[in-house]
Amino acid sequence: MDLTDTQQAILALIAERIDADGVPPSQTEIARAFGFKGIRAAQYHLEALEHAGAIRRVPGQARGIRLAGQGAQTRTAPVSEVARDDVLRLPVLGRVAAGLPIGADIGSDDFVVLDRVFFSPSPDYLLKVQGDSMRDEGIFNGDLIGVHRTRDARSGQIVVARIDEEITVKLLKIGKDRIRLLPRNPDYAPIEVLPDQDFAIEGLYCGLLRPNR
């Protein structure tokens, strides 16, 4: 199926955002970028892209768009049983709060083997989510999120951040004279980082796995 110029441009935008931010654009952002009056037009073009095999969509996720060839695979088998060039063996390093910050619980409890192309950018480890403050981004309690280890992040990216000795996952907003960590659930209040707090970016959110439960 041939793609229209608009659909090719939307596909390019999706790839660009995944490469730059680690997450695809939302339907609202696609509609805004192309001047659509509502998200229905964005949905129409995404349906066409999916039908053409250019993307696949994950039901129930606000940004559940994956480029063709991306897919989740959890394995309990040893790494030697799958092609080493195509997979990552990632440690599950405890918990991260999607709610109020919780005390860090970082330790290698388990490993997950998954397709190398599942996340972007490539993750260094996984954290288990506790809480539902990021539910509108499709991140739910019990999910395993991929984290790309870095100290650098831009405003608008979803980050794993440390405040004193506590770890949380939130949307980073950097203002002229303040830093805030925003939930994606109206039941939670933003967290403002105070000047006397020890604050650091631990990594970028780059996708998730949803264990069977």
UniProtKB/Swiss-Prot annotation:
A single GO molecular function, which one?
Answer: DNA-binding transcription repressor activity
Q: How does it assemble?
A: Homodimer.
For this entry, the protein name equals: LexA repressor 2
Entry GO terms, CC: protein-DNA complex
Q: Which organism is it from?
A: Xanthomonas axonopodis pv. citri (strain 306)
Q: Which HAMAP family match?
A: LexA
The record's section on SUPFAM superfamilies has: LexA/Signal peptidase, Winged helix' DNA-binding domain
- Where does the source fall among the domains of life? Bacteria
Q: Which Pfam families match?
A: LexA_DNA_bind, Peptidase_S24
The record describes the protein's role as: Represses a number of genes involved in the response to DNA damage (SOS response), including recA and lexA. In the presence of single-stranded DNA, RecA interacts with LexA causing an autocatalytic cleavage which disrupts the DNA-binding part of LexA, leading to derepression of the SOS regulon and eventually DNA repair.
Q: Which PANTHER family match?
A: LEXA REPRESSOR, LEXA REPRESSOR-RELATED
